[in-house]
């Protein structure tokens, strides 16, 4: 059960990361709200969103 939960969480994190990158590339609004930064499409910001 624990391994299954870990896999589910990993998939969710990757999905959120992918969606966040898509939003950042299209307009950048989501990342600005999350991190209060304007340069939301930089690699650092994407990593921070994925990790956060």
Swiss-Prot record:
Compartment list: Secreted
Expression (tissue specificity): Expressed by the venom duct.
Keywords, alphabetical: Disulfide bond, Knottin, Neurotoxin, Secreted, Signal, Toxin
One GO molecular-function entry: toxin activity
GO cellular component terms, A-Z: extracellular region
Disulfide cysteine pairs (residue numbers): 24-41, 31-45, 40-50
Stretch forming the signal peptide: 1-22
Record bears the keyword Cell cycle: no
Lineage: superkingdom: Eukaryota
Domain remark from Swiss-Prot or TrEMBL: The cysteine framework is VI/VII (C-C-CC-C-C). The presence of a 'disulfide through disulfide knot' structurally defines this protein as a knottin.
Function: Probable neurotoxin.
Protein name stated in the entry: Conotoxin Cal6.25
């Amino acid at each position: 059960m624990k391994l299954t939960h870990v896999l589910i969480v990993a998939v969710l994190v990757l999905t959120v990361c992918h969606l966040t990158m898509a939003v950042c590339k299209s307009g950048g609004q989501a990342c600005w709200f999350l991190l209060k930064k304007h340069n939301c499409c930089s690699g650092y910001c994407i990593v921070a969103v994925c990790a956060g």
